[in-house]
């Protein structure tokens, strides 16, 4: 009998000892042909602040990013990735119109082997979410910082992140004007 494959996933970090809790499961997920980008924000003294993450595997700053699994919707994938990478949940999500396409070559061949062979680019759906909780970094990141729009715009590596940040900042400013 062949050995069954297993998946080792991070369940979270113990709030008492800060050890990472792991789950071993036999469920193998299929990578969906889309990417998500999730932008954490909070309003501090009337000013939107954005949390930017430093990648552990590359010297670059970006927002939370990842791919869909199985039949997840982009929003469900964004919520899952947000918890996996930042340890936070939010009930305030805003779907953005910013949409980029990225080359499939950023996804490992193993993860995209079930995709149609004519798939060369995949969409990157973007979301903003209100983040009131403290961020708990996953091993995918070495640091995160809360920045103003201008500071975040300067620090971000990818144009798609800056474009989505611009849209979210415009939407938050407009919402703030309506409340005033």
What are the residue ranges of the model-derived segments?
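Short, positively charged and aromatic/hydrophobic N-terminal segments
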Residues: 7-9, 16-22, 26
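NUDIX/MutT-family hydrolases
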Residues: 124-166
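Conserved N-terminal beta-strand and adjoining loop/helix that marks the start
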Residues: 29-49, 70
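Short connector loops at helix/strand junctions that flank enzyme active sites
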Residues: 33, 63, 120-124
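Conserved Nudix-box catalytic region and its N-terminal flanking loop in Nudix hydrolases
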Residues: 47-91
């Amino acid at each position: 009998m062949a050995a069954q494959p297993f998946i080792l996933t991070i369940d979270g970090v113990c709030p008492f000892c800060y050890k990472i809790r792991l789950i071993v499961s036999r469920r193998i997920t299929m990578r969906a042909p889309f990417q998500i980008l999730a932008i954490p924000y909070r309003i501090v003294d009337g000013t939107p602040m954005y949390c930017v993450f430093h990648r552990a595997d590359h010297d670059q700053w970006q927002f939370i990013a990842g791919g869909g699994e199985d039949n997840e919707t982009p929003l469900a994938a964004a919520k899952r990735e947000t918890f996996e990478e930042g340890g936070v949940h939010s009930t305030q999500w805003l779907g953005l119109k910013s949409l980029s396409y990225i080359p499939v070559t950023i996804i490992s061949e193993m993860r995209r082997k079930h995709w149609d062979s004519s798939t060369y680019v995949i969409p990157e759906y973007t979301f903003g979410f209100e983040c009131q909780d403290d961020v708990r970094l996953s091993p995918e990141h070495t640091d995160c910082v809360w920045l103003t729009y201008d500071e975040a715009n300067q620090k971000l590596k990818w144009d798609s992140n800056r474009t989505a940040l611009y849209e979210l900042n415009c939407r938050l400013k407009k919402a703030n004007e309506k409340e005033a």
